[in-house]
Amino acid sequence: MKRICSIYRSPKRNEMYLYVLKSDVLKRVPPELLVAFGKPVHAFDLVLSPERALSREDINVVLENLDSQGYHLQMPPAEDDYIEHLPEELLRRNDPM
């Protein structure tokens, strides 16, 4: 079950991506989602299959969402994930003495 997918990034939120079937373009994405997402910026096209690994998403969930609803929305990582990667010095900077 291979799918050719177009991936768009959101101009409103860093690291938010919208996966759609290339043949459908954005036709099946609800208008309300497009308003919240912002004007989609094409990032790249990708062939998806169950054997392919994605860095932050479960490939089976992405493929299921593409088949059932016509799109998959990848949310940005939680802000806590960003904080964990900061140096200890920055994490402690505002702590009371």
Swiss-Prot record:
- Alphabetical list of PANTHER family matching this protein: PROTEIN YCGL
Q: What is this protein called?
A: YcgL domain-containing protein PSPPH_1548
Give the signal sequence positions.
none
Q: Which organism is it from?
A: Pseudomonas savastanoi pv. phaseolicola (strain 1448A / Race 6)
Highest classification ranks of the organism: Bacteria, Pseudomonadati, Pseudomonadota, Gammaproteobacteria, Pseudomonadales
Q: Which domain of life is it from?
A: Bacteria
Domain (YcgL): residue spans on this chain: 3-87
* Pfam families in UniProt: YcgL
